[in-house]
Amino acid sequence: MLMPLGGLLWWWCCCCGWYSCGLCTPAPQMLRHQGLLKCRCRMLFNDLKVFLLRRPPPAPLPMHGDPQLPGVAANNNTLPALGAGGWAGWRGPREAVGRETPPLPPPPPLPPSGDDDWDGPATGPPASLLSSASSDEFCKEKTEDCYSLGSSLDSGMRTPLCRICFQGPEQGELLSPCRCDGSVKCTHQPCLIKWISERGCWSCELCYYKYHVIAISTKNPLQWQAISLTVIEKVQIAAAILGSLFLIASISWLIWSTFSPSAKWQRQDLLFQICYGMYGFMDVVCIGLIIHEGPSVYRIFKRWQAVNQQWKVLNYDKTKDLEDQKSGGRTNLQTSSSAQANLPSAEEEAASPPAREEGPTRAASHPSGPVSQHHCAYTILHILSHLRPHDQRSTQGSGRELVMRVTTV
């Protein structure tokens, strides 16, 4: 290795000496070539430093089962391996794959140089090491974030939270007022009352279970609170109130003018009779307006009542709910069974041929028999079938039967 280096140095000195002697250059350019010689010498020393102090090439990776050499990393792409293999000669002994590496000799001292801005490879870690270290740190941070997210989710599943304010039991007692389960099972009583006051509905919007709430007492009138109303709700309240007042006033005046002896002349006047008709029409309009806006006003009143009254919300009782469902199912089953029991009897009577010897007079003289217990339309059709002539029925065919299905509405 030293022979090519010596030859290179000899060739460089010869070239520089040839030009420095002035054999090929004129005298005025001597100073300039001296400066070039200094620069070239400096570049030569820098190349020598790079050549002598460069990092040794990495050793080949050992196969499975082969003993690993000290100071050689198992994987050059990871931070611990690089620290053990690549940086062992620069930072002293470190652990590599569970073994202690023997101490290596320190690097040779750098030769003096006038170039203060030169940065050799020993002044800092290589770019591959920095990139691998940053990638390892990024993977570690992502792993920690995933672990913290998973632990927070696990803790959230274990700790019950209010489905309205998302707070735990430290904000108050948690109740389960409906059939909902899981993360939407629990809620605080104040949160639920406030939600009811905003919606105006006393049933769950998910499972449609009506909350079991007990009214304790009404607040002091001085403590009553107003609820937020939209423009449409204000118009609905005003329409319902004005319609009710007009309906009360007009009905009162019509009753007085109809039955009062002093208003006898009004009842005979044509103008007042026209007014009676107009007031009657307006009363019908007011009744329709009240019926249309009544549910909205009632919902607003329930919202106001939820805010200005003290309540106690009861927990969901599964056994009681099952009993209520069973009782309701039995009632519906009895109703449907009674309807189905009446249906075959009606079909049998409709399908049975009438007695020919009794004639139409006997059928018409007993309308209060079992036929009258069914629907009115069936009774009329049954009577009409008896009133038809016998020969007309025989010509239409004796194999046809009249079958009717009667359902209750």
From Swiss-Prot:
Residues 92-133, 323-372, 389-409 are annotated as: Disordered. GO terms for molecular function: ubiquitin-protein transferase activity; zinc ion binding. The lineage of its organism: Eukaryota, Metazoa, Chordata, Craniata, Vertebrata. SMART domains: RINGv. Its main location: Golgi. The gene is Marchf4. Disulfide bonds: none annotated. It is an enzyme of class 2 (transferase). This is E3 ubiquitin-protein ligase MARCHF4. It comes from Mus musculus (Mouse).
